[in-house]
A protein has these predicted regions:
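Class I S-adenosyl-L-methionine-dependent methyltransferase catalytic core
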Residues: 1-139
Length: 139
């Protein structure tokens, strides 16, 4: 997360495939103004809601129970400043998300975590063992 640096300051953050909310909650701890979380799995949603309550950040978050790809496909350009995504590695979600961002940049920066052997059409990629993070920037 530190690689995003000042981009998180006062940012509107979207956490796709949020799970427990770790990425979006960390963004808030690093100065983001707000975070929206998108998660479909009920146990993950429960954990997310517990984490939001435990951290006392309910006033600056929104939780959407939705399919993350479909949610992203409905967003207008520039809807968020920073988009964080940690999709399941077993599906093509990362590639679909990057392709959609290239057509419709719904944020200034997209950060997608994925398998390190997967090549995505990003602006830069950092590899850490079996995991990689690809970054895309809006034009």
């Amino acid at each position: 997360m530190s690689i995003l640096g000042d981009a998180l300051t006062d940012a509107r953050v979207l956490d796709l495939f949020a799970g427990s909310g770790a990425l979006g909650l960390e963004a808030l701890s690093r100065g983001a103004a707000s975070a929206s979380f998108v998660e479909l799995n009920p146990p993950s949603l429960h954990a997310l809601e517990q984490n939001i309550a435990a951290l006392g950040v309910a006033e600056v978050v929104t939780v959407h129970r939705a399919d993350a790809i479909r949610f992203a496909e409905r967003l207008p350009p520039g809807a968020f400043d920073v988009v964080l995504a940690d999709p399941p590695y077993t599906a093509d979600h990362a590639a679909r998300l990057v392709a959609h961002f290239r057509r419709n940049p719904f944020g200034r920066i997209l950060s997608v975590e994925h398998r390190s052997d997967l090549e995505l059409d990003g602006d830069s990629t950092r590899r850490y063992g079996d995991t990689a993070i690809t970054f895309c920037h809006a034009p």
